[in-house]
Amino acid sequence: KPPNVWRGSPAEDLCDLDDIVEPVVFYTGAAREAARDYAKNANVAATVALAGLGFEKTEVELCADPSISSNVHDVTVEGAAGTFRFEIAARPFPDNPKTSMLAAFSIVRALANRTTALVV
């Protein structure tokens, strides 16, 4: 994510967000700590952990990247059958750049799914 969205998080103590000129990985570890310490920024990591191996076995890297304007999530799944990788580059929500516009759409879909017989 862009450096400005990490303001108000522990990332401010780990790197100088104002002077970053190239991507800086400031957290590498389990999804549990990422979700706890970066609650406003690591919801995709938490979602992947819930859908996959759990919070302890899901590995997370958090990065401040001054070259991007989107909230980018790079997900890699490795297993005996092979490797699967995909990237989400979502535009930040105008009122809260720490989250993406996709988050609002996900909430709308979740509410719609509660009122329909067919869930997509």
Regions found by a protein language model. Give the residues of each.
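Active-site-lining helix/loop region of Rossmann-like oxidoreductase modules
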Residues: K1-V120
